[in-house]
């Protein structure tokens, strides 16, 4: 794994968060390098600068290295991005007092003079971000977006024109391009949220724009809902909760239990909380945590059931280290006799990991694509 970042005379040591031993993963990509090169070569750095979707702080660390006094407005939906950026600033002895933090639902201040962004995988979320920027940016403000060249096409440029202003793409460099968009100064109204029903479980679900499975139940969640464990549980964790559908169903099945919803996405946690209220579940029994797995979950919380539908990507990177961390956290936090109940694609072979960690693993249900596994501490 490469950790030495060197671009345009800027030298940094950058790590992913949480740390990964996978040799093909690093804390930045060529699009980060292209953005920084374009910015410096253009000689038109303007502050305050908003930095959006900066995976682990490569962009904010680079600008802080150039001038530690530049005010930066850092917006992220991922808790791991916040923690990784903080860690990399400390590691490189960079100040933090020039950073102002915003979640993906916060409104950036209207003093922003320049925006640096990475293109997220979820284009519905990206359109939402452009619309929010249209509400605060003056006409003529530049927005620079770094992305893989293969992700940039006429439809994406039309998305800019529709939601923020005219845009054009640079020449390719290391298979990336930088899109330059000029704000037209016309505020766009944000769309209403998506709401849909799961009648067989008497649930109504709403999703914010960066939450997986925007308007339907994904196949993994479907098989999981049909095969939740029977019994009495006092403390249940929906780990990687997304819109919270597993935890909501758990609240119906185990009405006396406290249900803890945890996700790396702030929008996911907000969606789960809204869904708890919308489905009129017991007040005081739902608890919501924006966290990197169970890293900061209070130590007095000892679950006897952890439900988990693990992701197998972090941003653009395909990886199983998040699932591995989830399983490790579950083993660490479950009370003795507690159960980890997961769903995953069959080809991911999660049974091998669970057998290694828990010394036991039972197949609860399966179909052609998915398998539900259970391990007991």
From Swiss-Prot:
Cross-referenced HAMAP family: 23SrRNA_methyltr_G (MF_01859)
Organism annotation: Shewanella oneidensis (strain ATCC 700550 / JCM 31522 / CIP 106686 / LMG 19005 / NCIMB 14063 / MR-1)
GO biological process: rRNA base methylation
Gene Ontology, cellular component aspect: cytoplasm
Compartments, as annotated in UniProt: Cytoplasm
InterPro entries: DNA_methylase_N6_adenine_CS, rRNA_m2G-MeTrfase_RlmG, RsmC/RlmG, SAM-dependent_MTases_sf, Small_mtfrase_dom
CDD domains according to UniProt: AdoMet_MTases
Function according to Swiss-Prot or TrEMBL: Specifically methylates the guanine in position 1835 (m2G1835) of 23S rRNA.
Catalytic activity from the UniProt record: guanosine(1835) in 23S rRNA + S-adenosyl-L-methionine = N(2)-methylguanosine(1835) in 23S rRNA + S-adenosyl-L-homocysteine + H(+)
EC number: 2.1.1.174
Ranges in coiled-coil conformation: none
Alphabetically ordered keywords of this record: Cytoplasm, Methyltransferase, rRNA processing, S-adenosyl-L-methionine, Transferase
Sequence similarity: Belongs to the methyltransferase superfamily. RlmG family.
UniProt GO molecular function: 23S rRNA (guanine(1835)-N(2))-methyltransferase activity; nucleic acid binding; rRNA (guanine-N2-)-methyltransferase activity
Primary localization: cytoplasm
Name of the featured protein: Ribosomal RNA large subunit methyltransferase G
Highest taxon of source: Bacteria
């Amino acid at each position: 794994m490469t950790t030495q970042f060197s671009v345009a005379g800027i030298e940094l040591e950058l790590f992913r968060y949480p740390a990964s031993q996978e040799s093909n993963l690093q804390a930045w990509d060529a699009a980060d390098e292209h953005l920084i090169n374009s910015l410096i070569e253009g000689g038109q750095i303007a502050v305050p600068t908003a930095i959006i979707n900066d995976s682990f702080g490569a962009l904010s660390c680079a600008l802080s290295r150039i001038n530690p006094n530049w005010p930066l407005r850092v917006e992220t939906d991922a808790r791991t991005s916040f923690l990784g950026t903080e860690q990399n600033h400390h590691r490189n002895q960079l100040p933090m007092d020039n950073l102002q933090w915003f979640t993906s639902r916060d409104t950036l201040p209207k003093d922003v003079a320049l925006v640096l962004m990475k293109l997220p995988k979820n284009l519905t979320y990206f359109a939402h971000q452009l619309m929010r920027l249209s509400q605060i940016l003056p006409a003529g403000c530049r927005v620079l977006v770094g992305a893989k060249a293969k992700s940039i096409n006429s439809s994406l440029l039309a998305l800019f024109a529709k939601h923020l202003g005219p845009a054009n793409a640079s020449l390719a460099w290391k298979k990336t391009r930088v899109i330059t968009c000029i704000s037209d100064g016309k505020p766009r109204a944000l769309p209403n949220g998506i709401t849909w029903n799961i009648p067989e479980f008497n649930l109504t679900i709403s999703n914010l724009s960066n939450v997986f499975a925007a308007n339907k139940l994904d196949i993994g969640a479907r098989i999981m809902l049909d095969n939740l464990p029977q019994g009495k549980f006092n403390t249940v964790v929906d780990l990687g909760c997304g819109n919270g559908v597993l935890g909501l169903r758990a609240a119906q099945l185990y009405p006396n239990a406290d249900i803890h919803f945890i996700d790396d996405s702030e929008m996911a946690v907000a969606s789960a909380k809204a869904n708890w209220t919308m489905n009129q579940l017991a007040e005081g029994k739902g608890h919501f945590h924006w966290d990197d797995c169970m890293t900061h979950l209070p130590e007095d919380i000892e679950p006897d059931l952890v439900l988990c539908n693990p992701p197998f990507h972090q941003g653009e990177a395909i990886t199983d280290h998040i699932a591995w961390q989830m399983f490790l956290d579950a083993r660490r936090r479950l009370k003795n006799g507690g159960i980890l109940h997961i769903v995953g694609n069959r080809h991911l072979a999660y049974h091998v990991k669970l057998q290694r960690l828990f010394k036991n693993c039972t197949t609860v249900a399966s179909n052609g694509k998915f398998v539900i596994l259970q391990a007991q501490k």
